[in-house]
């Protein structure tokens, strides 16, 4: 078995992680560390968390054998961990419940969050509505356009959504603004970070809350694999998309000790890995400090963070969780890239072969699984973390596919990142909706 105990007591994953924050936030971070240490294994806290996952979220989420896709692709059997079936439509709710429970116990009546694809914002707004907490969500204005259905969902749930106009107007900038808010309102505000990044203890804490995904898979997979005629009791490979990396770490972490299972993170290659328009921090970045932790960062020779690109708002981020950086360096996980076009093709393919509409983020993982399956035997298996559903992306996909659809952003005079470079696939039909 692979020996693995990370992070160390100071929150370091090898040379990565740590806590690089202003003096104003030092007390808040120390307070959070103490609270998490107190409640992490507290029986009442754990029981409440498990109750919420079962009765509010609807866990466990099922594992589905995508048998038609497996037959058509040839090679390995492909299984999907259906996080898209969770309440709010993605894996994000697993983490927001745990952090909101901490906020209540710490006496913080106000919650802030950042969001890219909008799923973390929706999940935060949802649990704040349930617990009666004030909720403010920061979102890059570019992502507000791309993910307008989720913006309205947040408003319905009582959250205030603040569009961020600085920088590239995407996830990085939303996180910057949320950090500024936290500094200004540290006494009464709890910051629910949505990914496995940020200062310690966030990378560890978010990973722990999300690891329910992989823990369920360890129980579910033996029966699924046996029924499919596979040769092992656990998958040969686990594949997940990586932006900040919370869904990937949630499914990877329980499998780290299983050396026979490959862990493969899929980054957004955008317009191509050599185009300069991508979000592949682990493959094209270098070690640096971003948003309170040391990790791989897309930066220029002067250490300035560079702009990123992806059709998926949730992957459009110039950094990555420090544990992913560590797993890459020690060789326990592999990281690959999928382009906008490959992800868009996988989105349409999964819709039409399995009747599942995936998020554009998840489509990157599906696209790589389709490639990988062809190199494997039929008695081998790939487990894909289908991290979210694609309802939020319908308008964007319509623009990217040049389809005639009534709620395309371009119909509202808005442009979508990547639309000028997207071409419809050969078997793609134009969808016309009656007006």
Swiss-Prot record:
Q: Does the keyword Transmembrane apply?
A: no
For activity, the cofactor(s) needed are: pyridoxal 5'-phosphate
Q: What class of enzyme is it?
A: lyase
Catalysed conversion reaction: (1S,2R)-1-C-(indol-3-yl)glycerol 3-phosphate + L-serine = D-glyceraldehyde 3-phosphate + L-tryptophan + H2O
Task: State if Electron transport is listed as a keyword.
Answer: no
| EC number per UniProt | 4.2.1.20
What's one GO-annotated cellular component? cytoplasm
Q: N6-(pyridoxal phosphate)lysine (modified residue): where? A: 92
Role description: The beta subunit is responsible for the synthesis of L-tryptophan from indole and L-serine.
Q: What do we know about how this protein assembles, alone or with others?
A: Tetramer of two alpha and two beta chains.
Q: What is the protein name for this chain?
A: Tryptophan synthase beta chain
List the source organism.
Albidiferax ferrireducens (strain ATCC BAA-621 / DSM 15236 / T118) (Rhodoferax ferrireducens)
The lineage, from the top, is: Bacteria, Pseudomonadati, Pseudomonadota, Betaproteobacteria, Burkholderiales
Name of the encoding gene: trpB
């Amino acid at each position: 078995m692979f020996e693995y105990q990370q992070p160390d007591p100071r929150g370091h994953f090898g040379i990565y992680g740590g806590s690089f924050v202003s003096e104003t936030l030092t007390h808040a971070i120390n307070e959070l560390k103490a609270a998490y240490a107190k409640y992490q294994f507290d029986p009442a806290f754990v029981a409440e968390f498990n109750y919420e996952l079962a009765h509010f979220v609807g866990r466990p989420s099922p594992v589905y054998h995508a048998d038609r896709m497996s037959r058509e692709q040839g090679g390995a059997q492909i299984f999907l961990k259906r996080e898209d079936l969770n309440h709010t439509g993605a894996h994000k709710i697993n983490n927001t419940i745990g952090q909101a429970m901490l906020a209540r116990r710490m006496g913080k009546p106000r919650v802030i969050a950042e969001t890219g694809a909008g799923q973390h914002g929706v999940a935060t707004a949802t649990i704040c509505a349930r617990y009666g907490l004030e909720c403010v969500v920061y979102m890059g204005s570019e992502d507000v356009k791309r993910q307008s259905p989720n913006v309205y969902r947040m408003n319905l749930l009582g959250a205030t959504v603040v569009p961020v106009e600085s920088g590239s107007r995407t996830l990085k900038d939303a996180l910057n603004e949320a950090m500024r808010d936290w500094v200004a309102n540290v006494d009464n505000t709890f910051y629910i970070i949505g990914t496995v990044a940020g200062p310690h203890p966030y990378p560890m804490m978010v990973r722990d809350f999300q690891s329910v995904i992989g823990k369920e898979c360890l129980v579910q997979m033996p029966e699924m694999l046996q029924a499919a005629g596979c040769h092992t009791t656990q998958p040969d490979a686990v594949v997940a998309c990586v932006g900040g990396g919370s869904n990937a770490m949630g499914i990877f972490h329980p499998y780290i000790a299983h050396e026979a299972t490959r862990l493969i993170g899929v980054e957004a290659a955008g317009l191509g890995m050599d185009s300069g328009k991508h979000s592949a921090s682990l493959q094209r970045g270098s070690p640096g400090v971003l948003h309170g932790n040391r990790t791989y960062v897309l930066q220029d020779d002067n250490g300035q963070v560079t702009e990123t690109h992806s059709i998926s708002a949730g992957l459009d981020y110039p950094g990555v969780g420090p544990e992913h950086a560590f797993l890459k360096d020690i060789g326990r996980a592999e990281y690959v890239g999928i382009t906008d076009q490959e992800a868009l093709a996988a989105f349409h393919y999964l819709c039409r072969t399995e009747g599942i509409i995936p998020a554009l983020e998840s489509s990157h993982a599906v696209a790589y699984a389709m490639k990988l399956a062809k190199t494997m035997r039929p008695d081998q298996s790939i487990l894909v973390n289908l991290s979210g559903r694609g309802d939020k992306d319908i308008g964007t996909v319509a623009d990217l596919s040049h389809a005639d659809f009534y709620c395309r952003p371009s119909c509202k005079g808005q442009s979508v990142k990547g639309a000028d470079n997207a071409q419809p696939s050969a078997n793609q039909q134009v969808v016309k909706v009656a007006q």
